[in-house]
Amino acid sequence: MLRIPVRKALVGLSKSPKGCVRTTATAASNLIEVFVDGQSVMVEPGTTVLQACEKVGMQIPRFCYHERLSVAGNCRMCLVEIEKAPKVVAACAMPVMKGWNILTNSEKSKKAREGVMEFLLANHPLDCPICDQGGECDLQDQSMMFGNDRSRFLEGKRAVEDKNIGPLVKTIMTRCIQCTRCIRFASEIAGVDDLGTTGRGNDMQVGTYIEKMFMSELSGNIIDICPVGALTSKPYAFTARPWETRKTESIDVMDAVGSNIVVSTRTGEVMRILPRMHEDINEEWISDKTRFAYDGLKRQRLTEPMVRNEKGLLTYTSWEDALSRVAGMLQSFQGKDVAAIAGGLVDAEALVALKDLLNRVDSDTLCTEEVFPTAGAGTDLRSNYLLNTTIAGVEEADVVLLVGTNPRFEAPLFNARIRKSWLHNDLKVALIGSPVDLTYTYDHLGDSPKILQDIASGSHPFSQVLKEAKKPMVVLGSSALQRNDGAAILAAVSSIAQKIRMTSGVTGDWKVMNILHRIASQVAALDLGYKPGVEAIRKNPPRLLFLLGADGGCITRQDLPKDCFIIYQGHHGDVGAPIADVILPGAAYTEKSATYVNTEGRAQQTKVAVTPPGLAREDWKIIRALSEIAGVTLPYDTLDQVRNRLEEVSPNLVRYDDIEGANYFQQANELSKLVNQQLLADPLVPPQLTIKDFYMTDSISRASQTMAKCVKAVTEGAQAVEEPSIC
């Protein structure tokens, strides 16, 4: 772990405030005056020339500089003239001094940039027509704006062998300009020291030295930060140009973080998914599953309603026939004979529609696949099941205790925040659970949940660390709550959090208790009053079961009576569809305007990027049509009316991009004392231990060939999925 060298590279950084990006400015209160092309600007001591220029709206060209990475200063494209200085300086690395007059467009600056650009293009293949970076390439843009109109280089160009670093990132290393952005991203953000440089001068190459897969859950981000076409997307190769695609701002549902994304589509098909800036959630990064699992949206899709015939086979039918059959069964059964299970990719609109439908047939047996303890405060207090500190709040914490979770694969962008704070703010991290590679050092306290009792009682050495902390966080993974002693684990963590608040120097508004969820629908379902887990259905098996996107395999045919009528509504023929008597095809997250609530309780919206395939429809519309045929018509016909209903049930569900602060931690702790469950000695083992467990976790990613290639590459090595380069 290269914590010390990286910190030396980032020397001069102040402690990162909440939600901000890396800056070289110090905490000094006295400002100094500098001039940019004669325009006065006040900046803090330590501000670089480039930052001072940006403060007045002057854009300086750059290739190696990136706001979230350490300064390398090796591309020299940002050269500017300082009045009375003998030579031009690199704007990204030079701190300003009082009274400087920075000349960004002087003849000297222009000639320096032209010279640098000429050197960069000397060995560049200039293969823009067949380069996937074409149209969004920094080298194209800056050579047009700052380069010369001709080259003096007449010798043969350098050629570099391409590297095979796995099934996601395609390399054409002849295009590489050695900006080292990918290397710095890998070591600083992803925490993986797989990439580096070998050789020097004309022989310098970027690669892995020994051919191997770039083993990171964030590897796709090096495609975005590469300023040229050296690193591009393998699945996207030669499929579309950026100006041909339609961009739709949306939300990711592959985990519970709720990363902001842009869905690029062409001719009704998702071509690629890119990150969208959101400082409080994902900054400008997304995980590989978010970025590359989109091909699963085209495979194993349910496109037409299906019913099981007399021979026990599922056959296609019309919407009228399918809905009539389901409505007839709904009219035959009432109350406890009817139950529903909601899966991990279901939106809030569908959840409230299904809840209203079952309530109208006198049933309240609405369950989620994911278990959450109901003993003690359970789900009655919102603070008991949220990441209360917020994702960006990690940057303010000084101690983090992780319990029964592997955030690197359960919530990669949350883990990246922890690593960022660990690098910049000297964050101390401890883990109770199976030892895993989190990309940062931590104190492993053991894997037994009984350690929680020792910490709560104050007998464990780590109790003193928590007591001395000013802003501690205790993060409990939702996977730990799936155990038989989940209620006892939750009660113990609640007790620790409350004791910290009472005995340490924690400020009044700082929240210690945090739950890290893994699936996108869980928080909204709990907000709407769904029962966590399917234990109620196992104890009292229904005669009609509605599976709304339930593909987790939490219940099987063997758990239900032989005459139980099962309806599956969803978008993939995965785990739930084969056991159903009727299948109603729904829309995936890229095909509907829908509300999702992330693990910190922040409501966000997806937008329609493409239309659902075949006869598939949005989930709430299917449920609304079903209610009308069944004679229990739901009182809404439009999306706005459904959201008005959401507001009636839980107002926070329509306060988009806003977090309603949760409270009542003391009351939750008092109620947790009523839990009489005992902690087990079994070790806390998160379900996603290694990167192989990360790629295929839901119906979309399980249908993705790209994710299957990743699993194969991790299992057998990158050579197993090597693809010859066309270029």
Curated annotation (Swiss-Prot):
CDD domains in the record: fer2, MopB_Res-Cmplx1_Nad11
Presequence range in chain numbering: 1-23
Gene Ontology terms: cellular component: mitochondrial inner membrane; mitochondrial intermembrane space; mitochondrion; respiratory chain complex I
The 4Fe-4S His(Cys)3-ligated-type domain, residue ranges: 108-147
Boundaries of every 4Fe-4S Mo/W bis-MGD-type domain copy: 245-301
Residues that bind [4Fe-4S] cluster 1: H124, C128, C131, C137
Protein's UniProt keywords contain Coiled coil: no
Localization annotation: Mitochondrion inner membrane
Keyword Oxidoreductase on entry: yes
InterPro entries: 2Fe-2S_ferredoxin-like_sf, 2Fe-2S_ferredoxin-type, Mopterin_OxRdtase, Mopterin_OxRdtase_4Fe-4S_dom, NADH_UbQ_OxRdtase_75kDa_su_CS, NADH_UbQ_OxRdtase_ferredoxin, NADH_UbQ_OxRdtase_Gsu, NADH_UbQ_OxRdtase_Gsu_4Fe4S-bd
EC number: 7.1.1.2
GO biological process: cellular respiration; mitochondrial electron transport, NADH to ubiquinone; mitochondrial respiratory chain complex I assembly
SMART domains reported in the protein's UniProt record: NADH-G_4Fe-4S_3
Family: Belongs to the complex I 75 kDa subunit family.
Subunit text: Core subunit of respiratory chain NADH dehydrogenase (Complex I) which is composed of 45 different subunits. This is the largest subunit of complex I and it is a component of the iron-sulfur (IP) fragment of the enzyme. Complex I associates with ubiquinol-cytochrome reductase complex (Complex III) to form supercomplexes. Interacts with MDM2 and AKAP1.
Record-linked PANTHER family: NADH-UBIQUINONE OXIDOREDUCTASE 75 KDA SUBUNIT, MITOCHONDRIAL, RESPIRATORY NITRATE REDUCTASE
Task performed by this protein: Core subunit of the mitochondrial membrane respiratory chain NADH dehydrogenase (Complex I) which catalyzes electron transfer from NADH through the respiratory chain, using ubiquinone as an electron acceptor. Essential for catalysing the entry and efficient transfer of electrons within complex I. Plays a key role in the assembly and stability of complex I and participates in the association of complex I with ubiquinol-cytochrome reductase complex (Complex III) to form supercomplexes.
Name recorded for this polypeptide: NADH-ubiquinone oxidoreductase 75 kDa subunit, mitochondrial
Organism (species): Pongo pygmaeus
Gene (name only): NDUFS1
